[in-house]
C-alpha cells in the first residue's frame, strides 16, 4: 500500500470501502460495483474478508465520470480512459 511521508512519519494512505464512498458521493453501491467491473475505477486493495478498498483518487475519478456522463455514454467514457492510459504508458 502506498504511503506518504509528512517529514517525520511514514503515514499510510487511507483506503475506503464502498460504503464510505457511497456516503460521500452521489453514487450507489451498485454503481460503484459496475464502474469497477467496467474498469472505470480500480480497487487499490482488498480486505481479508474480500471487500474492495479504494484509495483517495477514486473520488476525483468519480467526479470526472459524473461530469463526462452529462454528454457521454459509459462506453465512450471507458474508451476515453483507455486512450488516456495508453498515452500515459507511451509517455513513460
Language-model region placement:
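Arg/Lys-rich, alpha-helical DNA-contact motif
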Residues: 1-24, 37-38, 42-48, 53-92
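Key DNA-contact positions within bacterial/archaeal DNA-binding proteins
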Residues: 30
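Short glycine/serine/threonine/alanine-rich loop segments
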Residues: 27
